């Protein structure tokens, strides 16, 4: 799904692919 794709992009690029979802990303744990 989109979230899995976003995590893959983050892993590959080291960048958050969804900057507009920064707060949501923090909630879900971009760092693992």
From Swiss-Prot:
Keyword tags: Calcium, Disulfide bond, Hydrolase, Lipid degradation, Lipid metabolism, Metal-binding, Myotoxin, Secreted, Toxin
GO molecular function, one term: phospholipase A2 activity
Catalysis performed (reactions): a 1,2-diacyl-sn-glycero-3-phosphocholine + H2O = a 1-acyl-sn-glycero-3-phosphocholine + a fatty acid + H(+)
GO biological process, one term: lipid catabolic process
First-tier enzyme category under EC: hydrolase
One GO cellular component, as annotated: extracellular region
Subcellular location: Secreted
EC id: 3.1.1.4
Pfam families membership: Phospholip_A2_1
Tissue specificity comment: Expressed by the venom gland.
Domain of life: Eukaryota
Principal localisation: secreted
Sites where the protein binds Ca(2+): 27, 29, 31
SUPFAM superfamilies: Phospholipase A2, PLA2
Subunit-structure text: Monomer.
Family: Belongs to the phospholipase A2 family. Group II subfamily. K49 sub-subfamily.
Summary of the function given for this chain in its UniProt record: Snake venom phospholipase A2 that shows high myotoxic activity, slight neutrophil activation (demonstrated by activation induction of IL-1beta production), slight cytotoxicity against Jurkat (leukemia T) and SK-BR-3 (breast adenocarcinoma) tumor cell lines, and slight antiparasitic activity against promastigote forms of Leishmania amazonensis. PLA2 catalyzes the calcium-dependent hydrolysis of the 2-acyl groups in 3-sn-phosphoglycerides.
Extra remark: Does not induce platelet aggregation and does not inhibit collagen or ADP-induced platelet aggregation.
Protein name per its UniProtKB record: Basic phospholipase A2 BmatTX-III
């Amino acid at each position: 799904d989109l979230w899995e794709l976003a995590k893959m992009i983050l892993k590959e690029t080291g960048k958050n692919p969804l900057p507009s979802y920064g707060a949501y990303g923090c909630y879900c744990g971009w760092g693992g």
